[in-house]
Amino acid sequence: MKIWVDADACPGVIKEILFRVADRAKVEVTLVANHSMRIPPSRYINMVTVPSGFDVADDEIVKRLDAGDLVITADIPLASEVIDKGGVALNPRGELYTEQNIKSILNMRDFMDTMRASGVQTGGPAAIGASEKQAFGNQLDRFVTKHHKPV
């Protein structure tokens, strides 16, 4: 099991949690982004830099993903592709995307896109607070404990 991170939009506090989990649990964490990022020195943390472009990082994650891998992303269409390929998707707020909920989440996203396109100002999500950070950490710990077997 590996952890893939849609790193361009992933908040720094979430990356820090992932870095700690990588070393503690000895699980491979790979950040994928269209620009280089600073990562701590660790045999478990990797960086993949892809060319700039629409969905290039997403496509790279899906290409490299194996069934059972975890992907950290707030990108709902990417989460849907991950689930279709047998992976698991977790957003930075600690919400797990599943086969049971991804279709309704995609529908809500499409509805909000339609609203914005018609001129309705919907606002964006609030900044990640302590409760979301804790929810993410808890969900990540549960997943890693259940699915990762250190070599």
Swiss-Prot record:
Pfam families: DUF188. InterPro entries: UPF0178. PANTHER family: UPF0178 PROTEIN YAII. Belongs to the UPF0178 family. This is UPF0178 protein Swoo_1444. It comes from Shewanella woodyi (strain ATCC 51908 / MS32). The lineage of its organism: Bacteria, Pseudomonadati, Pseudomonadota, Gammaproteobacteria, Alteromonadales.
